[in-house]
């Protein structure tokens, strides 16, 4: 009787392990074009290795995705080292990319058992942008130049306004005091609002495809406020142990240049292609 009970327990345990290993890898992303494209690229890479995936893309901001990963509701999602360093770990910005990556990798492994994949090959830092004609007319080329123009109307994403490494820290570092309260909106509405003249300055991302397409001027971060934002995937440790998952993500090391990421983003935002189609063509 005892032997049958032990055998039954062993079968239950084996079934549980088999179920966990057979479960599709759940891939998440934040809610803007680049993130969804990267999620699709990861999904395609895993599928080519014979790994079943479940796409949970376009979820929300950094905190939403991080909490889902820690809670075991996601298995991986694309993230940026600077975001992890300042927004998640609440550390003051530093400019050394190697140190940021090392500190982030150690902290994520120690606190949550999470692994950072090799860097994808590009950074996506915050970028303050203006209509090109306005920037030239007003002689604005650097973020510090904005301090002389409090009349300009800023427009920012919700997360940029809330994050310590976003607008609050930027305003303090550069002495910015716009007369108008920043208009807060979804990231996808920033460039249309700029094109329609509803705002004058937006905080986008340096790899946004519409920057070139719209002829915008990106202002130089002349006080080096923003930390490095290298792109990679954050993966649950148990999932990273799967050799096929690891092989798929390691194969993406250094494969996406900044220009390539801008082209991928533009193919979605300007040309109207789906993120899935763009990822397949990558």
Regions found by a protein language model. Name each.
Residues 88-117, 196-201, 210-224:
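Ligand-binding "clamshell"
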Residues 24-54, 120-192, 273-277:
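Bilobed "Venus flytrap"/periplasmic-binding protein-like clamshell domains
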Residues 70-79, 150-153, 169, 189, ...:
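Alpha-to-beta junction loops
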Residues 58-62, 72-85, 100-101, 131, ...:
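Beta->alpha turn/N-cap motifs
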């Amino acid at each position: 009787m005892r032997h049958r009970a032990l055998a039954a327990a062993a079968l239950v345990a084996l079934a549980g392990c088999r179920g966990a290993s057979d479960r599709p890898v759940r891939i998440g992303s934040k809610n803007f074009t680049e993130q969804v494209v990267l999620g699709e690229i990861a999904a395609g890479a895993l599928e080519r290795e014979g790994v079943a995936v479940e796409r949970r893309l376009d979820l929300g901001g950094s905190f939403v995705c991080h909490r889902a990963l820690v809670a075991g509701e996601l298995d991986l999602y694309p993230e940026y080292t600077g975001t992890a360093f300042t927004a998640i770990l609440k550390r003051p910005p530093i400019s050394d990319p190697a140190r940021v990556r090392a500190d982030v990798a150690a902290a994520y492994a120690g606190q949550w058992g999470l692994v950072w994949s090799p860097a994808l090959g590009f950074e996506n830092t915050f970028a303050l942008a203006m209509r090109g004609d306005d920037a030239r007319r007003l002689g604005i080329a650097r973020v510090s130049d904005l301090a002389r123009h409090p009349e300009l109307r800023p427009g920012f994403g919700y997360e940029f306004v809330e994050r310590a490494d976003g607008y609050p820290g930027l305003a303090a570092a550069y002495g910015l005091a716009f007369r108008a309260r920043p208009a807060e909106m979804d990231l996808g509405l920033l460039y249309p609002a700029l094109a329609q003249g509803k705002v004058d300055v937006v905080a986008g991302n340096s790899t946004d495809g519409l920057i070139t397409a719209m002829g915008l001027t990106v202002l130089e971060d002349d006080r080096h406020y923003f930390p490095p934002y290298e792109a990679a995937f954050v993966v649950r440790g148990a999932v990273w142990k799967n050799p096929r998952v690891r092989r798929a993500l390691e194969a993406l090391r250094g494969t996406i240049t900044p220009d390539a990421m801008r082209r991928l983003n533009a193919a979605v935002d300007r040309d109207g292609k789906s993120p899935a189609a763009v990822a397949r063509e990558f």
